[in-house]
Design a protein with these regions (language model features):
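N-terminal small-domain helix-loop-helix segment of the aminotransferase-like
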Residues: 2-97, 102
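Structural signal for conserved beta-strand scaffold positions within catalytic alpha/beta enzyme cores
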Residues: 39, 92, 116, 137-139
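Short glycine-rich anion-binding loops that position phosphate/pyrophosphate groups of nucleotides
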Residues: 43-45, 96-97, 121, 165-169
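Conserved PLP-anchoring active-site segment centered on the Schiff-base-forming lysine
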Residues: 106-127, 138
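A short helix-loop-beta submotif of the ANL/AMP-binding
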Residues: 130-135
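Active-site phosphate-binding strand-loop segment of PLP-dependent enzymes
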Residues: 141-172
Protein backbone atom coordinates (compact mmCIF):
# COMPACT_ATOMS: atom_id res chain seq x y z
CA UNK A 1 0.00 0.00 0.00
CA UNK A 2 1.30 3.44 -0.93
CA UNK A 3 1.31 5.97 1.88
CA UNK A 4 0.98 9.63 1.09
CA UNK A 5 3.33 11.74 3.20
CA UNK A 6 1.64 14.30 5.40
CA UNK A 7 2.78 17.90 5.67
CA UNK A 8 4.33 19.28 8.84
CA UNK A 9 1.83 20.18 11.58
CA UNK A 10 2.68 23.86 11.19
CA UNK A 11 1.58 23.65 7.54
CA UNK A 12 -1.49 21.47 8.15
CA UNK A 13 -2.81 24.06 10.61
CA UNK A 14 -2.83 26.87 8.03
CA UNK A 15 -6.37 27.68 6.94
CA UNK A 16 -6.80 27.67 3.15
CA UNK A 17 -6.87 31.10 1.52
CA UNK A 18 -10.37 32.29 0.67
CA UNK A 19 -10.14 34.56 -2.37
CA UNK A 20 -12.74 37.20 -3.14
CA UNK A 21 -15.74 36.03 -5.10
CA UNK A 22 -15.66 36.38 -8.87
CA UNK A 23 -17.87 39.19 -10.17
CA UNK A 24 -20.08 36.70 -12.00
CA UNK A 25 -20.80 34.74 -8.81
CA UNK A 26 -21.59 37.88 -6.82
CA UNK A 27 -23.87 39.14 -9.61
CA UNK A 28 -25.81 35.84 -9.59
CA UNK A 29 -26.17 35.85 -5.80
CA UNK A 30 -27.41 39.44 -5.66
CA UNK A 31 -29.27 39.45 -9.00
CA UNK A 32 -27.11 42.29 -10.31
CA UNK A 33 -25.77 43.16 -13.72
CA UNK A 34 -22.08 42.12 -13.63
CA UNK A 35 -21.11 45.37 -15.36
CA UNK A 36 -22.53 47.32 -12.40
CA UNK A 37 -20.01 45.76 -9.99
CA UNK A 38 -16.57 47.24 -9.41
CA UNK A 39 -14.35 44.71 -7.66
CA UNK A 40 -11.79 46.34 -5.40
CA UNK A 41 -10.85 43.19 -3.45
CA UNK A 42 -8.12 40.65 -4.15
CA UNK A 43 -5.66 43.38 -5.20
CA UNK A 44 -7.12 43.46 -8.72
CA UNK A 45 -7.25 46.52 -10.95
CA UNK A 46 -10.89 47.23 -11.91
CA UNK A 47 -9.69 49.33 -14.87
CA UNK A 48 -7.83 46.47 -16.51
CA UNK A 49 -4.51 46.64 -18.29
CA UNK A 50 -3.41 50.01 -19.68
CA UNK A 51 -2.79 50.27 -23.41
CA UNK A 52 0.88 51.13 -22.78
CA UNK A 53 1.36 47.96 -20.71
CA UNK A 54 -0.49 45.85 -23.29
CA UNK A 55 1.83 47.15 -26.03
CA UNK A 56 4.97 46.37 -24.01
CA UNK A 57 3.70 42.87 -23.15
CA UNK A 58 2.84 42.17 -26.78
CA UNK A 59 6.45 42.99 -27.75
CA UNK A 60 7.64 40.14 -25.52
CA UNK A 61 5.08 37.46 -26.47
CA UNK A 62 7.66 35.41 -28.36
CA UNK A 63 9.73 35.13 -25.17
CA UNK A 64 7.03 33.79 -22.80
CA UNK A 65 8.09 30.21 -23.48
CA UNK A 66 11.53 30.92 -22.00
CA UNK A 67 12.53 31.33 -18.39
CA UNK A 68 13.24 34.96 -17.53
CA UNK A 69 16.46 36.17 -15.94
CA UNK A 70 15.89 34.86 -12.42
CA UNK A 71 18.47 37.22 -10.97
CA UNK A 72 16.72 40.30 -12.35
CA UNK A 73 20.06 41.68 -13.53
CA UNK A 74 18.69 44.54 -15.68
CA UNK A 75 16.00 45.57 -13.21
CA UNK A 76 18.36 45.46 -10.23
CA UNK A 77 20.89 47.62 -12.05
CA UNK A 78 18.25 50.17 -13.08
CA UNK A 79 16.87 50.30 -9.53
CA UNK A 80 20.39 50.48 -8.14
CA UNK A 81 21.16 53.56 -10.24
CA UNK A 82 17.86 55.24 -9.42
CA UNK A 83 18.03 54.54 -5.67
CA UNK A 84 21.78 54.99 -5.24
CA UNK A 85 22.31 51.59 -3.62
CA UNK A 86 24.16 48.44 -4.55
CA UNK A 87 22.29 45.80 -6.59
CA UNK A 88 23.40 43.37 -3.87
CA UNK A 89 21.04 45.18 -1.48
CA UNK A 90 17.98 44.47 -3.63
CA UNK A 91 15.73 41.42 -3.51
CA UNK A 92 13.19 40.88 -6.26
CA UNK A 93 10.13 38.68 -6.02
CA UNK A 94 6.79 37.88 -7.57
CA UNK A 95 4.82 40.23 -5.37
CA UNK A 96 5.05 40.93 -1.67
CA UNK A 97 4.00 37.37 -0.74
CA UNK A 98 7.10 35.98 -2.40
CA UNK A 99 9.47 38.37 -0.63
CA UNK A 100 7.81 37.95 2.78
CA UNK A 101 7.97 34.16 2.43
CA UNK A 102 11.66 34.37 1.42
CA UNK A 103 12.36 36.39 4.56
CA UNK A 104 10.56 33.81 6.70
CA UNK A 105 12.51 30.95 5.11
CA UNK A 106 15.78 32.79 5.69
CA UNK A 107 15.19 33.86 9.30
CA UNK A 108 12.45 31.82 11.01
CA UNK A 109 12.17 28.35 12.49
CA UNK A 110 10.61 26.70 15.55
CA UNK A 111 13.11 28.41 17.89
CA UNK A 112 12.45 31.94 16.64
CA UNK A 113 9.69 34.52 16.74
CA UNK A 114 8.21 37.15 14.45
CA UNK A 115 6.22 40.20 15.46
CA UNK A 116 3.25 41.56 13.53
CA UNK A 117 0.30 43.81 14.20
CA UNK A 118 -3.30 42.78 14.75
CA UNK A 119 -5.13 43.16 11.42
CA UNK A 120 -1.85 42.75 9.55
CA UNK A 121 -1.42 41.48 6.02
CA UNK A 122 -2.38 37.80 6.28
CA UNK A 123 0.88 36.62 4.69
CA UNK A 124 2.84 37.88 7.71
CA UNK A 125 1.05 35.33 9.89
CA UNK A 126 1.08 32.59 7.25
CA UNK A 127 4.81 32.94 6.59
CA UNK A 128 5.49 32.77 10.33
CA UNK A 129 3.23 29.75 10.84
CA UNK A 130 4.64 27.90 7.82
CA UNK A 131 8.08 27.99 9.47
CA UNK A 132 6.74 26.70 12.82
CA UNK A 133 7.92 29.98 14.34
CA UNK A 134 6.20 31.73 17.22
CA UNK A 135 4.04 34.66 16.14
CA UNK A 136 3.69 37.64 18.48
CA UNK A 137 0.58 39.60 17.55
CA UNK A 138 0.57 43.16 18.89
CA UNK A 139 -2.82 44.88 19.31
CA UNK A 140 -3.37 47.71 16.86
CA UNK A 141 -4.17 51.36 17.44
CA UNK A 142 -7.14 52.40 15.28
CA UNK A 143 -6.30 49.54 12.87
CA UNK A 144 -2.72 50.82 12.56
CA UNK A 145 0.60 49.63 13.93
CA UNK A 146 1.47 50.35 17.57
CA UNK A 147 5.19 50.74 16.98
CA UNK A 148 6.06 51.25 20.65
CA UNK A 149 4.29 48.04 21.67
CA UNK A 150 5.88 46.23 18.75
CA UNK A 151 9.29 47.41 19.96
CA UNK A 152 8.44 46.32 23.51
CA UNK A 153 7.41 42.87 22.23
CA UNK A 154 10.90 42.12 20.88
CA UNK A 155 12.39 39.01 22.50
CA UNK A 156 15.86 37.51 22.26
CA UNK A 157 14.55 35.03 19.68
CA UNK A 158 12.79 37.65 17.50
CA UNK A 159 14.16 37.64 13.98
CA UNK A 160 11.52 39.50 11.95
CA UNK A 161 9.24 42.43 12.69
CA UNK A 162 6.61 42.72 9.96
CA UNK A 163 5.46 46.33 9.45
CA UNK A 164 3.30 46.46 6.34
CA UNK A 165 2.79 49.91 4.85
CA UNK A 166 0.41 50.25 3.19
CA UNK A 167 -1.28 47.44 5.06
CA UNK A 168 -3.90 45.14 3.58
CA UNK A 169 -6.69 44.93 4.80
CA UNK A 170 -6.68 48.24 6.72
CA UNK A 171 -5.02 50.53 4.20
CA UNK A 172 -2.88 52.07 6.94
Amino acid sequence: MTRIPTPLDCVQNIAPYQPGKPIEELARELSLDPTSIVKLASNENPLGCSEAVAQEVSKELNEVARYPDGSGYKLKNQLSSKLGISPDNLILGNGSNDILEMAAIAFLDHDRSAIYSEFCFVVNKLATQSRAAYGIEVPSIDYGHDLERMRDAIQTDTRIIFISNPNNPTGT
